[in-house]
C-alpha cells in the first residue's frame, strides 16, 4: 500500500473570463520512506500540486477533481483536521524558503510552534528538539542561531531551516 497516493488530481483557477487549468489529472504514488521531488519549468504546476496535497489552495483556485490519500484516509475529506497531517505525516519544502518562513518570528519560535502543534512537548522539550533538528540539517552552532530571524540566514541556511520544519 502506498503511503501517499494522489489520484487524478486537478486544480483549476476560475478567472474573470476563463478557467485556468493549473494541474490536470496528476497521479503520484509515494511509499513510506521515499522522498519525492517535483521538477519542471516555471509555471508548470509544481507548487500548485504541492499546495493541493496539503489543502492550501487559495481562492480563486480549487481542487476540481481527484483525491489525496494518506494510507486509506482522503485528507481532503477532513479539512478541519488537515493540520494533523500537514507537517506530521507530510512535509513540503518549496524552492524559495523565504516565502515559507515568518519574518517577524525567530527561527526558534517557528520551530517550537511547529513541534508543539504536532507533539505534546513542553516549550523546553520543543526547544531541545528544535536545536537537534537544526544540527541535523547542518546549521552550525545551532543553539546560538536559535534566536536569529530568517533574514539573518543565507538562502541555503534558510532552506535547511525549512527542511528542519518539514522533519518536525
Identify the meaning behind each predicted range.
Residues 1-168:
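ABC transporter nucleotide-binding domains
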Amino acid at each position: 500500500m502506498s503511503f501517499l497516493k494522489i489520484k487524478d488530481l486537478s486544480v483549476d483557477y476560475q478567472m474573470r473570463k476563463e478557467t485556468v487549468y493549473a494541474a490536470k489529472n496528476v497521479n503520484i504514488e509515494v511509499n513510506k520512506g521515499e522522498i519525492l521531488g517535483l521538477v519542471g519549468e516555471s509555471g508548470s504546476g509544481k507548487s500548485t500540486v504541492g499546495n493541493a496535497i496539503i489543502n492550501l489552495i487559495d481562492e480563486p483556485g480549487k481542487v476540481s477533481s481527484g483525491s489525496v490519500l494518506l494510507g486509506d484516509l482522503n485528507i481532503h475529506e477532513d479539512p478541519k483536521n488537515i493540520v494533523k497531517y500537514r507537517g506530521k505525516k507530510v512535509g513540503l519544502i518549496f524552492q524559495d524558503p523565504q516565502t515559507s518562513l515568518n519574518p517577524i518570528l525567530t527561527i526558534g519560535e517557528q520551530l517550537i510552534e511547529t513541534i508543539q502543534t504536532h507533539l505534546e512537548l513542553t516549550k523546553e522539550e520543543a526547544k531541545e528538539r528544535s536545536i537537534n533538528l537544526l544540527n541535523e540539517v547542518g546549521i552550525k552552532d545551532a543553539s546560538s542561531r536559535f534566536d536569529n530571524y530568517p533574514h539573518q540566514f543565507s538562502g541555503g541556511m534558510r532552506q535547511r531551516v525549512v527542511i528542519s520544519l518539514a522533519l518536525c
